Amino acid sequence: RSGMGNELNLVPVDKFTQQSKEYSNVFALGDANDIPASKAGSVAHFEIDVFVDNFLQYIAGKDMTHRFDGHANCFIETGEGKAMLIDFNYDTEPLPGRFPAAGIGPMSLLKPTRLNHLGKLAFKWIYWNVLIPGRPMPISTHMSLAGKRTDLISAK
């Protein structure tokens, strides 16, 4: 153990930049940090997109201007050949609606459907043939409210 972790052995970081709160030259991503977000693979993927831009600024001695918004999305198997899809971030809880994914088409949010189950199965191919080789994903790093039932967001 590095001794950088908190009582849960997670590195305390700025949730927007993943920069350590104690060591300015350390960044912790994914399962290693204490951000208030899911430990889903999508979170690590979106964090890394933001981190790369910030790290290039950091090593050039510039201010880090990119911010991770806590974006997470994942399929949840619900049984009987159906799955739900959720999409959320630090500020917005999962909302019902449609998830517009370029080239894939609309998928239902917070609703068990066969299409979502098939999307989850297709993601295995996307993982190995798009994500692992480092090809860009057709999903924005920052959460979009497009297609979501924003009328359900309560005023804070």
Segments the model singles out, each with a brief description of its role:
Residues 5, 10, 17-19, 49, ...:
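A generic structural micro-environment signature
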Residues 16-23, 57-62, 105-110, 118-119:
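Short C-terminal domain-edge/linker segments immediately following a structured domain
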Residues 29-46, 78-88, 128-142:
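A broadly tuned preference for mixed-charge, low-complexity surface segments
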Residues 6, 11, 25-35, 66-75, ...:
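Noncatalytic linker/hinge segments flanking ATPase motor cores
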Residues 1-49, 56-57:
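FAD-site-proximal beta/loop scaffold in flavoenzymes
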